[in-house]
């Protein structure tokens, strides 16, 4: 694996946050997701073959967890699988609504990336650190019994033609259940469309967690699998609905009002991209 420079890493992060912040189209397919009719919705959200490992991470006390995870790794369970199970356990438990919980989710992909750049005998260390924090917070939250995410029951309040505007209006109206239904309808058609449409809601303001969350969920799809895109992106829908109920949201909404004015003022729509290279000295001066 080629060594990644600090500049390359920051460039990757910057590109991802720009996509999440201003709503540009997704660059690749994120897979499909599942929603349910109201009359056949199951009680619990489950994850197939990964469910036993997900439950282990939810139900095991943090002080007993690490020896079990090391034993699993030594017996052949990959770090990738451990991180995937942790991401799904985190999403199902917190649903993007717990401050420590979603910060832990955001740390999972970077921890896995760091593990791939370490010598084999040291590679589990960054992953184990975040998995410990993840399970510790899940236990503080109540474990498996306190899960936030459940299968979405679809009702006549939404239709297969739900749009980004429908989702947006439900979020602005602080109607979490309706927003979840619209988003599930959208995700049934295309996870790529779901990602783009949730970004239209995210870009309403520039609050940092709101911007970073869908980018980190996107990043984790390479680990958990694109079939879990709906589960991972639902966290942003719920976060945005919750944000509408707080005063901080009005403070952070200024960007959504200013950005269109700047685009018009400087005629940025359709303008050719510049070719000036950001020299190290210029970057240093700017920062």
Stretch-by-stretch model annotation:
Residues 2-287:
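Mature, well-folded catalytic/scaffold domains that follow N-terminal targeting or propeptide regions
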């Amino acid at each position: 694996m080629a060594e990644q420079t600090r500049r390359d890493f920051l460039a990757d992060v910057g590109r991802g946050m720009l996509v999440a912040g201003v709503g540009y189209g997704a660059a690749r397919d994120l897979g499909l997701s599942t929603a349910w009719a109201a009359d056949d919705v199951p009680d619990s959200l489950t994850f197939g073959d990964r469910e036993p490992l997900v439950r282990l991470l939810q139900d095991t006390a943090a002080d007993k967890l690490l020896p079990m995870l090391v034993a699993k790794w030594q017996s052949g369970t990959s770090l990738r699988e451990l991180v995937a199970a942790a991401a799904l356990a985190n999403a199902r438990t917190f649903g993007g609504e717990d401050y420590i919980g979603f910060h832990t989710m955001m740390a999972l992909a970077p921890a896995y990336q760091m593990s791939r750049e370490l010598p084999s005998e040291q590679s589990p260390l960054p992953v184990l650190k975040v998995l410990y924090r993840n399970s510790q917070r899940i236990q503080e939250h109540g474990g498996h019994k306190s899960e936030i995410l459940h299968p979405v029951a679809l009702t006549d309040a939404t239709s297969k033609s739900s749009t980004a505007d429908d989702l947006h209006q439900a979020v602005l109206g602080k109607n979490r259940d309706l927003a979840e239904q619209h988003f599930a309808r959208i995700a049934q058609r295309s996870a790529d469309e779901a990602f783009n449409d949730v970004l239209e809601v995210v870009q309403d303001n520039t609050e940092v967690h709101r911007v970073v969350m869908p980018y980190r969920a996107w990043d984790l799809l390479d680990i958990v699998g694109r079939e879990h895109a709906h589960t991972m992106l639902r966290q942003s829908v719920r976060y945005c609905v919750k944000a509408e109920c707080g005063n901080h949201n009005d403070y952070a909404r200024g960007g959504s009002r200013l950005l269109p004015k700047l685009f018009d003022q400087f005629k940025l729509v359709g303008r050719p991209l510049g070719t000036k290279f950001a020299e190290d000295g210029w970057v240093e001066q700017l920062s």
